[in-house]
Amino acid sequence: MKKKTTLSEEDQALFRQLMAGTRKIKQDTIVHRPQRKKISEVPVKRLIQEQADASHYFSDEFQPLLNTEGPVKYVRPDVSHFEAKKLRRGDYSPELFLDLHGLTQLQAKQELGALIAACRREHVFCACVMHGHGKHILKQQTPLWLAQHPHVMAFHQAPKVYGGDAALLVLIEVDEWLPPELP
């Protein structure tokens, strides 16, 4: 099968005349690969910074006023108390789960910070934090830490389906998501 060319006969003859006496160069040099920017480092650094920023809000010194009677619950002052009722009834189903079993208090704070950052980044409104029973250290501290974070709108003891009194359902304030504009 012949190759189709768009050059005229005169142009082809001129090209052959100009290329007469040339020879193919032997490739004996090293091929340089283009330098690639390490993409994976930037997000990892950003994630670590988000975790540190989010866990910065958690203090062991501050004791917010939480209801000590009945199930553990909290609603930020600017949020409707109906949201806690929805959490209690299980109207919200969590999309992310965090299991704090076996973690130290420092690790638990970091993981809580990472969870809140992930919820905001992924536009997840509801998450479940399983603190367990254990020695009651994390069970007591987790609500105190969550009440201090400005992006936590409300939390309530989880329904039995999600862990009962060994877990909390948390409502996270997320930025309004807008779809990208089409050109």
UniProtKB/Swiss-Prot annotation:
One GO-annotated biological process of the protein: rescue of stalled ribosome
Family annotation (Pfam families): Smr
Name this polypeptide is given: Ribosome rescue factor SmrB
Keywords: Endonuclease, Hydrolase, Nuclease, RNA-binding, rRNA-binding
Protein's job: Acts as a ribosome collision sensor. Detects stalled/collided disomes (pairs of ribosomes where the leading ribosome is stalled and a second ribosome has collided with it) and endonucleolytically cleaves mRNA at the 5' boundary of the stalled ribosome. Stalled/collided disomes form a new interface (primarily via the 30S subunits) that binds SmrB. Cleaved mRNA becomes available for tmRNA ligation, leading to ribosomal subunit dissociation and rescue of stalled ribosomes.
Species annotation: Escherichia coli O7:K1 (strain IAI39 / ExPEC)
PROSITE patterns: SMR
Domain of life of the organism encoding this protein: Bacteria
Family: Belongs to the SmrB family.
SUPFAM superfamilies xref list: SMR domain-like
Any one GO molecular-function label of the UniProt entry: rRNA binding
Assembly mode: Associates with collided ribosomes, but not with correctly translating polysomes.
Keyword field contains rRNA-binding: yes
EC number, UniProt record: 3.1.-.-
Entry keyword annotation includes NADP: no
Enzyme superclass (EC): hydrolase
Residue ranges constituting the Smr domain according to the UniProt record: 98-173
Annotated Gene3D superfamilies: 3.30.1370.110
